Amino acid sequence: MSLDALQQRLGYRFSKPELLQQALTHRSHSAMHNERLEFLGDSILNCAVADMLYGMFGKLDEGDLSRVRANLVKQQALYEIAQMLQLPDALRLGEGELKSGGFRRPSILADALEAIFGAVFLDGGFDAARTLIRKLYIPILEQVDPRTLGKDAKTLLQEYLQGHKIALPLYTVVATHGAAHNQQFEVECSIPKLEIRVSGSGASRRAAEQSAAKLALDEAHRLVPQLVKRSRAERTGKTRKQATPPDPQLSLRLKE
C-alpha cells in the first residue's frame, strides 16, 4: 500500500511524509526505525483514550476507568485496528522478518500503529493525534459495555465458565484460507460440558478465537441457566427422597 493510500485511510495528510514512512519501518529493515515513535505514540494514545473515557463514562470510578483503558489500548485491540487500516500491506520489514510472516505478527502491527500516533503528533500536534485516535476508537467505544469494563470475548467467556465451575473452552484452528499475505483463519471453540461447538473467523488466529468466543459466550448464556435449573431440580429430588420416612406397614408386609 502506498503512503498516499494509507493517509487516505487515516484521514490525515502528513506535511512530512517521511515521519509516516519511519512509523511503518521495523528495526529489521533499517536503522531509522519506529521504536522511538512507538514510545511517543503509546503515551499519546493513553492520554487520548483516557480523555474519551472520562467524557463518556461519568459513573465509572478511577479504578474502573483504568481497567477499561487497559483493555482498549492493549496489543489485541491495536492489532485489530491495524488490520482494519490494512497496515500489513504498508509495513517495511527486513527480509528475514518478511519471510517469517512478520507482517501478520500482532506485536509488530500494534507497535506500528502506536508509532503512527507518535508521527501524527510530531507532524500536526496533539489535537491532530487526538482527532485521529477518536476517529478510530469512537466506533469501538460505542460498543463498550461499562459493566464488563471493555474486556474481550475470550476473557468474558473464561470468567463466566469459571464462575459456574465449568472447564475452560478449547480453541482449535480448523482451516486457513487465502494467500499468505491475506489469510483468513477459522477457529472452533468447544465447551464439552455444555455441548457447545461454534466457529469464528478472522484475519489472525487471535481474531478468529475472539469471534468464536463471542458466539460461544452467547450460547453459554443461554444454556448455563438451564443447566443450573436442572441441577437444582435433581438435588431437590434427591433430598426429598432421602427425607421420606419408611412406611412401617410396608416393612411388616415385606417381613411376612
UniProtKB/Swiss-Prot annotation:
Query: What keywords appear on the UniProt entry?
Result: Cytoplasm, Endonuclease, Hydrolase, Magnesium, Metal-binding, mRNA processing, Nuclease, RNA-binding, rRNA processing, rRNA-binding, tRNA processing
From the record, give the transmembrane residue ranges: none
Q: Which GO terms describe its molecular function?
A: double-stranded RNA binding; metal ion binding; ribonuclease III activity; rRNA binding
Please state every residue range assigned to the domain named DRBM: 152-222
| E.C. number | 3.1.26.3
Tell me what reaction this enzyme catalyses.
Endonucleolytic cleavage to 5'-phosphomonoester
Q: Name one GO cellular component term.
A: cytoplasm
What's the main place this protein lives? cytoplasm
Report quaternary structure and partners.
Homodimer.
The UniProt entry, under PANTHER family, shows:
RIBONUCLEASE 3, RIBONUCLEASE III
Query: Of which family is this protein a member?
Result: Belongs to the ribonuclease III family.
Main role?
Digests double-stranded RNA. Involved in the processing of primary rRNA transcript to yield the immediate precursors to the large and small rRNAs (23S and 16S). Processes some mRNAs, and tRNAs when they are encoded in the rRNA operon. Processes pre-crRNA and tracrRNA of type II CRISPR loci if present in the organism.
| Protein's name in the database | Ribonuclease 3
Species whose genome carries this gene: Ralstonia pickettii (strain 12J)
